[in-house]
Amino acid sequence: MSETETRPTNFIRQIIDEDLKSGKHSSVHTRFPPEPNGYLHIGHAKSICLNFGIAQDYQGQCNLRFDDTNPEKEDIEYVESIKNDVNWLGFQWSGDIQYSSNYFDKLYGYAVELIEKGLAYVDELTPEQMREYRGSLKEPGKNSPYRDRSVEENLALFEQMRDGKFKEGTICLRAKIDMASSFIVLRDPVIYRVRFATHHQTGDKWCIYPMYDFTHCISDALEGITHSICTLEFQDNRRLYDWVLENITIDCQPRQYEFSRLNLEYTVMSKRKLNQLVTEKLVNGWDDPRMPTVSGLRRRGFTSASIREFCKRIGVTKQENMIEFSSLESCIRDDLNESAPRAMAVLEPVKLVIENYEEGKVETLNIANHPNKPEMGTREVPFTREVYIEQDDFREEANKKYKRLVLGKEVRLRGAYVIQANRIEKDEAGNITTIFCSYDEDTLGKNPADGRKVKGVIHWVSADKALPAEIRLYDRLFTVPNPGAADDFAATINPESLVVKNGFVEPSLATAEAEVGYQFERTGYFCADNKDSSADALVFNRTVGLRDTWAG
């Protein structure tokens, strides 16, 4: 962090400041604990920036821990993807990567301790019976008929569970807390269940697995986490978090703090809905540039700096709110406006022939890579007798507000000459196929000698030297701000969320690196696709337009 940059403030940082000042903690230790059962999205990025950012700013530590207690839904592919996303966002975890599965032996021991204290019991209610016994927000729960088993019987049964003597769904270990609690999470929650599943870290060593609420708090304590930060849906779970730690023999007593999760307009972040988009092929995979996944945003051309800035701007509160999608777009637009070199691309070409320009001549023009940053240098752009311009940049007739090329009028080609449109050719359907022009040879890099004013400037590429490219125009995936609230969210998908154009780009883009942003002049910000683009077949993704077309 630079000296001029101010450290963000929020209620969590205020708590940390007080804890350090009072001597409650001498240092700060946070963690980011994803379950490896899917790809990270921008909501996770908010949590990553918060937890790793706090560790950075307070010269503390932040662990990356995989909460891997559900082997049927987890995969090493997700582990690797999450590691890559955290690194790409600009963060590095402290020490080795942690896994909750590293603590399975200790977790088993703590479960035995609860049984020995009379605070856990083996239950044989069916899942349906357990739901019935649990009660509701208005009705207290009922005690299981197995609740008062002896410590000895519970220990023996739990050992048999571990040894694989029971079928899945027939038996579990529950904490003995209070079936009449006003908090349903405290109504004797399940803390271990039988699962005959191969685990990606521990193989077939275990056939019983601890539940998240039991595992999470103990993992935090074993790692010396000082501030366990999670989203608001875990607010009630804090009571169970504290209960577990207060009733086992463990040194560290972390505290859990909750903040509001990210809700972003025009997208969904529910894992179930995102999975539906992929499995029903409504998008092209988890890294589709329309997806809110970190890999999708990265492929679209969002920079890690822009996502960090977005997370900084939206802040950290306990208040649930919906963030405008334009806020995210503003961050990447601000970033690329400063950093992206300029280039020219024509998405809907029409040929323009300069009749008084020498046939076969190729002129090399040096054009600035950035209008305000001479240190970014120049690039060579070939100029020839025939060029392509955008169809929208020409009209046969137009009013004075139209500042582009009009029949009989002049315009400047960006970085090149002033030209005048003299005549056109059309096909049988009436579409313009060719615009015939003349150029003023004495206007390269300067105004016409006779002082006439030429106000319009349009971009172009050489028809002979330009490279064909597939241009993917990405837009918001949904047509409504809150698609998750719709009865059928898939019905609100924006049919214009991907429009493909076959255009031409200037030759300098032949070596464009994937994910590196360019401003296609007068069009938007683009990057080469990180999967489909190659030297033989260029593919560019639109990251964001030059301005917010959804405003107002």
UniProtKB/Swiss-Prot annotation:
Catalytic activity: tRNA(Gln) + L-glutamine + ATP = L-glutaminyl-tRNA(Gln) + AMP + diphosphate
E.C. numbers: 6.1.1.18
Disulphide bond pairs: none
Primary site of residence: cytoplasm
Location within or outside the cell: Cytoplasm
Domain of life: Bacteria
Motif 'KMSKS' region location, chain numbering: 268-272
Gene Ontology biological process terms in this record: glutaminyl-tRNA aminoacylation; glutamyl-tRNA aminoacylation
Motif 'HIGH' region per record, residues: 34-44
GO MF annotation list: ATP binding; glutamine-tRNA ligase activity
UniProt KW Ligase keyword: yes
Residues reported in the UniProt entry to bind L-glutamine: 67, 212
Entry binding sites for ATP: 35-37, 41-47, 231, 261-262, 269-271
Sequence similarity: Belongs to the class-I aminoacyl-tRNA synthetase family.
Assembly: Monomer.
NCBIfam families tied to this protein: glnS, PRK14703.1
Protein name stated in the entry: Glutamine--tRNA ligase
Species assigned in the record: Aliivibrio fischeri (strain ATCC 700601 / ES114) (Vibrio fischeri)
Gene (UniProt): glnS
